[in-house]
């Protein structure tokens, strides 16, 4: 039963899309700067007494065609989430927009504007082409952090916490758990402010936002960049009522973060999320090695072994010195 579930999850589109990143890793090769790690939710660039954070997202073409307002909203929201997942705060976004006509982008722009207002992040420029043979949208974001939450610092014996806003519902056509578009904007911002507080207070140094790969794909990316293994306890993952676990494991929540926490800080971190009516549950443990193991109802199965198969291809960078520098900062 568990082995069959693992096989389905490995074949899910979110996991397959993450493997596409290997093409970029190979194609860009050794041009990267050792001082800027690849594989985090944002590029963290040293700047004076902190870091500039830079990230970008391209929107699914089918989402743009079928639900353009939501696509516009998500283009801002997912970038904002990337900044906060690194312990930062957003400064501004820019967009790159292609459309077949001026009329065909009105809903995209309306969704982008609504999210920019809700998250208080200005859209300050970009590129627009209304004479394209297709509609497309990508958005980039700039942020700043004093101290980082990064994907490179998970350590054996860390406790894995999943922090999720369960006050939402699934999009009717996509694996998106929407707890944002009708929520109070101030609440959205307050919920996100927990992440930079965790970084500044040094209660946490390792986090990743739950993205298109769902909880399971996010864990793979986190363990790959940290050169660790993990055990994920499926029975402890908070799941909405009447939602099958298989569907939830690959869902993309509007507010979802996976954190790797030193055991002595777990209770304090959980209290911060729970005080804002967010679910924050222990879902596993980081282990020595290269294997990610799924566990449920007394049964265990190997889900991934990085010694046999890469996910993104960013695990073999020369990161030891900078990872220590980030931890010491």
What is the predicted function of each stretch?
Residues 260-267:
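Helix N-cap motif at beta-to-alpha junctions
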């Amino acid at each position: 039963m568990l082995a069959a579930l693992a096989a389905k999850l490995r074949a899910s589109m979110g996991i397959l899309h993450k493997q596409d990143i290997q093409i970029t890793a190979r194609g860009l090769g050794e041009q990267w700067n050792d001082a800027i790690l690849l594989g985090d939710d944002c590029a963290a660039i040293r700047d004076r007494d902190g870091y500039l954070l830079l990230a970008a997202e391209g929107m699914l073409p089918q989402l743009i065609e079928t639900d353009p307002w939501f696509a516009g909203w998500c283009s801002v929201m997912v970038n904002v989430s990337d900044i906060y997942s690194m312990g930062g705060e957003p400064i501004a976004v820019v967009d790159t927009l292609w459309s077949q006509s001026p009329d065909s982008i009105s809903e995209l722009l309306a969704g982008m504007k609504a999210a920019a207002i809700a998250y208080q992040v200005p859209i300050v420029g970009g590129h627009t082409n209304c004479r394209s043979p297709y509609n497309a949208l990508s958005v980039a974001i700039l942020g700043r952090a004093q101290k980082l939450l990064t994907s490179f610092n998970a350590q054996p014996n860390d406790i894995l916490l999943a922090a999720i806003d369960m006050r939402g519902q699934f999009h009717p056509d996509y694996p998106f758990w929407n707890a944002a578009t009708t929520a109070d904007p101030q609440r959205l911002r307050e919920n996100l402010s927990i992440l930079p507080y965790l970084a500044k207070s040094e209660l946490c140094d390792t986090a990743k936002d739950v993205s298109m790969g769902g909880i399971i794909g996010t864990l793979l990316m986190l363990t790959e960049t940290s050169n660790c293994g993990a055990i994920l306890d499926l029975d402890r993952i908070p799941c909405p009522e009447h939602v099958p676990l298989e569907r939830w494991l690959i869902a993309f929540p509007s507010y979802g973060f996976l954190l790797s926490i030193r055991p002595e800080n777990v209770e304090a971190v959980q209290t911060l999320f729970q005080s804002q009516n967010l679910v924050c549950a222990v879902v596993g443990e980081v282990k020595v090695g290269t294997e990610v193991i799924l566990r449920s109802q007394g049964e265990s199965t190997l889900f991934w072994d990085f010694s046999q198969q890469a996910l993104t291809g960013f695990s073999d960078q020369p990161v030891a010195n900078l990872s220590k520098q980030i931890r010491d900062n």
